[in-house]
UniProtKB/Swiss-Prot annotation:
The keyword Nucleotidyltransferase does not apply. Keywords: Isopeptide bond, Metal-binding, Methylation, Nucleus, Phosphoprotein, Repeat, Ubl conjugation, Zinc, Zinc-finger. SMART domains: ZnF_C2H2 (SM00355). This is Protein Wiz. Disulfide bonds: none annotated. The lineage of its organism: Eukaryota, Metazoa, Chordata, Craniata, Vertebrata. Pfam families: zf-WIZ. Residues 1-79, 376-399, 546-578, 819-843, 972-1038, 1091-1174, 1283-1331, 1463-1554, 1629-1651 are annotated as: Disordered. The modification Phosphothreonine is found at T998. There is a cross-link at residues 883, 939, 955, 967, 988, 1000, 1005, 1056, 1108, 1112, 1138-1139, 1177, 1240, 1282, 1343, 1356, 1370, 1372, 1382, 1448, 1464, 1477, 1523, 1534, 1560, 1630 (Glycyl lysine isopeptide (Lys-Gly) (interchain with G-Cter in SUMO2)). May link EHMT1 and EHMT2 histone methyltransferases to the CTBP corepressor machinery. May be involved in EHMT1-EHMT2 heterodimer formation and stabilization.
Amino acid sequence: MEGSLAGSLAAPDRPQGPERLPGPAPRENIEGGAEAAEGEGGIFRSTRYLPVTKEGPRDILDGRGGISGTPDGRGPWEHPLVQEAGEGILSERRFEDSVIVRTMKPHAELEGSRRFLHHRGEPRLLEKHAQGRPRFDWLQDEDEQGSPQDAGLHLDLPAQPPPLAPFRRVFVPVEDTPKTLDMAVVGGREDLEDLEGLAQPSEWGLPTSASEVATQTWTVNSEASVERLQPLLPPIRTGPYLCELLEEVAEGVASPDEDEDEEPAVFPCIECSIYFKQKEHLLEHMSQHRRAPGQEPPADLAPLACGECGWAFADPTALEQHRQLHQASREKIIEEIQKLKQVPGDEGREARLQCPKCVFGTNSSRAYVQHAKLHMREPPGQTTKEPFGGSSGAGSPSPEASALLYQPYGAAVGLSACVFCGFPAPSESLLREHVRLVHAHPHWEEDGEAYEEDPASQPGTSQDAHACFPDTAVDYFGKAEPSLAPMWRENPAGYDPSLAFGPGCQQLSIRDFPLSKPLLHGTGQRPLGRLAFPSTLASTPYSLQLGRNKSTVHPQGLGERRRPWSEEEEEEEEEEDVVLTSEMDFSPENGVFSPLATPSLIPQAALELKQAFREALQAVEATQGQQQQLRGMVPIVLVAKLGPQVMAAARVPPRLQPEELGLAGAHPLDFLLLDAPLGGPLGLDTLLDGDPAMALKHEERKCPYCPDRFHNGIGLANHVRGHLNRVGVSYNVRHFISAEEVKAIERRFSFQKKKKKVANFDPGTFSLMRCDFCGAGFDTRAGLSSHARAHLRDFGITNWELTVSPINILQELLATSAAEQPPSPLGREPGGPPGSFLTSRRPRLPLTVPFPPTWAEDPGPAYGDAQSLTTCEVCGACFETRKGLSSHARSHLRQLGVAESESSGAPIDLLYELVKQKGLPDAHLGLPPGLAKKSSSLKEVVAGAPRPGLLSLAKPLDAPAVNKAIKSPPGFSAKGLGHPPSSPLLKKTPLALAGSPTPKNPEDKSPQLSLSPRPASPKAQWPQSEDEGPLNLTSGPEPARDIRCEFCGEFFENRKGLSSHARSHLRQMGVTEWYVNGSPIDTLREILKRRTQSRPGGPPNPPGPSPKALAKMMGGAGPGSSLEARSPSDLHISPLAKKLPPPPGSPLGHSPTASPPPTARKMFPGLAAPSLPKKLKPEQIRVEIKREMLPGALHGELHPSEGPWGAPREDMTPLNLSSRAEPVRDIRCEFCGEFFENRKGLSSHARSHLRQMGVTEWSVNGSPIDTLREILKKKSKPCLIKKEPPAGDLAPALAEDGPPTVAPGPVQSPLPLSPLAGRPGKPGAGPAQVPRELSLTPITGAKPSATGYLGSVAAKRPLQEDRLLPAEVKAKTYIQTELPFKAKTLHEKTSHSSTEACCELCGLYFENRKALASHARAHLRQFGVTEWCVNGSPIETLSEWIKHRPQKVGAYRSYIQGGRPFTKKFRSAGHGRDSDKRPSLGLAPGGLAVVGRSAGGEPGPEAGRAADGGERPLAASPPGTVKAEEHQRQNINKFERRQARPPDASAARGGEDTNDLQQKLEEVRQPPPRVRPVPSLVPRPPQTSLVKFVGNIYTLKCRFCEVEFQGPLSIQEEWVRHLQRHILEMNFSKADPPPEESQAPQAQTAAAEAP
């Protein structure tokens, strides 16, 4: 055997000269040594291939391959067992030719084989490779217990292992340290016998003519990153060997360093989860990830760059860590891709689900769906998309692919798996049948020509991984990270497949072989599927043939060549770095490639070599097991042409034509990964069915529904989802609806993006649009329009033609009022020129530089020192931090009309620039004009002012902010405002301009309080000179941190804490409803103010600043104003409250917030009635007779809270500006006068009015507010909001639609009586002289005060006892059943807020609409209505019923009124729903029907008309309040109101109002179609209140007996049931009285609620 083996192996080794067969060249023959061949020192001593030889220390892979040549150069190609036998191999047998035939270990490190022989641009010959020889142990048969008898083999067998026992393979690494791997034999011993035939030398020379032949292998390096090689790696594993023919590369093909040529197949982005197949794509993507400046090393210090993403690093360690991140990310992605592929495999034709496009079948719907994705976008000519059929078995078919069957590592001997799909077969025959059926016809075979022509049409989803290799054959792969060695086609004439594949071959079983767990080990492995040529073609479309071609080559089975072996688990690490190349022959006859290569193209030397191998295998004398082993190890000569074009292609990364690639292209990893796309952030769909050309294109992806384009699939998918969502189509069914349909649907429904309004902001002019009134700048006309509306609301104008712009209205108003001395907009003195509105007239300077300090007191730079950095240059306020100053500056900007959204930049600079542009308007501050220019003038004006600017803007807008305390240090007001009381600044008191609207400008909105804390003399602060303009200084910015409770003085960090604290105080007082602005803080302040006013010693308030200013001062002062329940002197505003009687609407009567009077039911009993409404529109000013609150009312005593109003009333012109205590924007209902914090609340409120009117569509602009306004206009109802009384005559002013602004002057009439509840449609108190007993309160909550509206609605009928108990200030916080019916107009009930939850029929108030709805249902049941046909709401249904059954309503109300005859006036008064139904109150002097009382306390002439439309004159008793109430009680149209509410508009519905209402109601209403039975009548309500509540505890009395119910609101149910029992017992006959619109209080309706 020795001789035969040696001879047979040596025979081919005899070629002379250049034909010497190659063997690993001796070390000394390698030019420059191994390093020269390999570069990089000891990384890889041998560039490429591991010959299966007895190799010594000259390990080709330098420790990686473990196969090394001996120092003497001898590297005979011997059987592994001939470890010591080197006789047959001559050292001179080396490569001296251009071609070398080398054998490759299947597990040899891919890095080495991946490398070209040329390093650093220097061509290296293959012969320069070190040679070495491995040592193998024969695997003996059972009967062979000794060493082989073939001494000639020089077999060095340490011991005869038992049959089928693991054999040991010993490799001698570079350092000659043997490394041993124990291999478990998988397969029968007969398979090992074939190894005997392998004992021939490993070096054979080929003629130079073989230059056309070259080889490639794919390598995997688990330890090193794709671009690096680790120096010394663990030993190699055995496996089939490949004899490779490498053509010497032309000089131009320099082997780039590993970092360049070893491109990974997957390029993951370590910043996100996206990965790419092309490095270019990753580089492009990385541009989206900009490193922080600190992370980017300096250019001169960053020579190291990541080969994948291009990031530069100055430190090699950092670069290495970065690469490891790439590698870890890559492996994770690959692992995830494999998991996606692990779906149930092919189950054959017997399966329930069969693929219509291929032979795949399965019983798993999930597997079927996954498989179907393979065909999703498959080109028509393709049958399957994936080379391996994606673990479902439908992958790349190839005929008779049994050669590619492998056995999973650790699997049973008889279990094999298909390399294409991983299908496990219990037997080889079944596996072959599987391959024949499933992988029989490669689709590239069907239209190979097309593929050659169009790479994009090639199959598979790995978009650039498939190509036809006409001159290439792809190597098989085997290992956990199977390295795919290129397979080359060989001339059939020179190759006998029978030699390689015997019938009894075992399927190759490599550890964790490809499809089951590819690439699960080896963090640093090079990407699988790389060709040997170090080119960027690694990811070009040419890896498809790998498995397919293999299988087609040897249908009879590759396993004979591939000894099935498996290794111990613990040696997994060692094998990871082994070059693993399995070889396969793709012969043309197998159909894998068209027979392009003719025998002439195959070097004769290669054919001779193959023949020599064949003969050697046949001649070797060994047992069957040895033969099998040798056959698995003998090289298979694969021949392919490698032309110059291929060499060039190896250097060119871009997409190449398949014919150019040959063996040069590297196969991307995705080939092994079942065609998983490696080139983009694509979803599984794209993974499985991507277009090969797609990844190669850099073009963006286009949305199928619109022209938008996207860089990645994620963005496109999200965008497409948006399209589909808009048309109501699920993303998952997008394939069932065409793009045209989607587009059509979108067009049909106008699903178009709203065009964003481009702000026409011109930094050169700061604003293209400015308010003519206050100069505030706006970017858009819409913003200016909204701002103008606010000004108009300030002037009391809320109704205008819908087609007219509020900007134009404001301009006209200013133009017409200029001659009449309109309210000085920006502090312009009344005598100033009409056009001196500061902002509109000031030059507009570009807002480019920070506000220069030229206007400041200090000529030096404003930022010269730290102090200036935190001091407001406008008002001098000092702040601890710049942040506080910034917040303060924002408040100034708001005052100047610049919303926060407009001042997104630095507010400080913006403010300074704005002030600079406006020249620090001194006019609006009342300062001398020069003040803005220089501090000198300011100093003249303000004695101690540290900065003139302090006074100039004086926080004018503090108050305007809706009760937002402007946060400045507590001492702010004191700071810089040391100006003496006589300071002219303070002289600009707006008292004279009480009637003029305060501009919305910063100054105009600010309360008129001087900035100086506690000015020495209130008079100095509030000079009453009537000719002086309004003091536009607001009380200094509210202390930023000085938010304190005005009741107990406790400090809080913010308003939120104070609000919670105030709620606790209010609850203690029994007040549970925050009737002032909905704010407990303001409510508490109002209560405290009333108490303060009620103090007899309080001096009468001198005329206060403009009501709006005061309102702002008070409302905006919020907590910051520090208005505490202290002596008035302690309060900033106290002097105002004491000294100046606020103008009629002026908030000064109350606490700075001038909150509206609390509703009677919620008001603390001991509190004085609020003297001022929040919003002081003429119509809002209401003469409120708070019987409960006026202990001495019967005796004609002034109510304490009204004292301050007594004297100064005569000189005040009606202030037509609503005091700004209400929500800043002064949003109020034009129908009922109720205020709202925002338009949203008003809109909801307006909807309720409209529903009551039977209007359910908002026909005007789609806005219920505009619709209601339009209806009011059509009804010709004078809208008091529009009318402002002339300064001289308040009542006429109310009646007429005068301009909103009134010439500044002393208020002539004591006070304009606001329409009831301040609602526009309600009559106001007519007589100019209103008794001091009446508190004039603008209706703040739009809720009539139960106690007295000097309005037609009879004030709550007070019991004599109630009135006679002066000490018992009955806040009427209880629902009084016998209250005079609040003639709530139909719309009045509408407010959904708890304050407006009032029954239209009986007038009962409820805490919320839910309770009201329950009450309405009871009414409806009484009237036989059981379906709520109007909007499904019983409340609205009842309203409709009232409209259509006026007679019944009248009868019912008449009954409730104690049998008084029903009159139509009653009905009209009670039910007027539309504004037209309410005559304006007090428009005429006699129109004060509500209270018809003259100021002296005697009922006015029209008092009689108040409630019943003038039918009953009011009693003329001096205690007009009592008389009025008496009279109101008697009025037919007074509906009993259970609960005294704050004066509501309903009160105003007396007098002419009732007449008008009645007439209009009669016009509008249809005659009742029929009369339905009325619920049984109950006894007349008692004269005492049946319902009282304090806090949340209700006391409900039975009107029939003495039983009382006490408890929360839920106690009402028991009370109602009790009343119902009484009613049932009375058994009244069901009369049918025609009640109409009276709204009775809860208690009354409760009785009516009896079913």
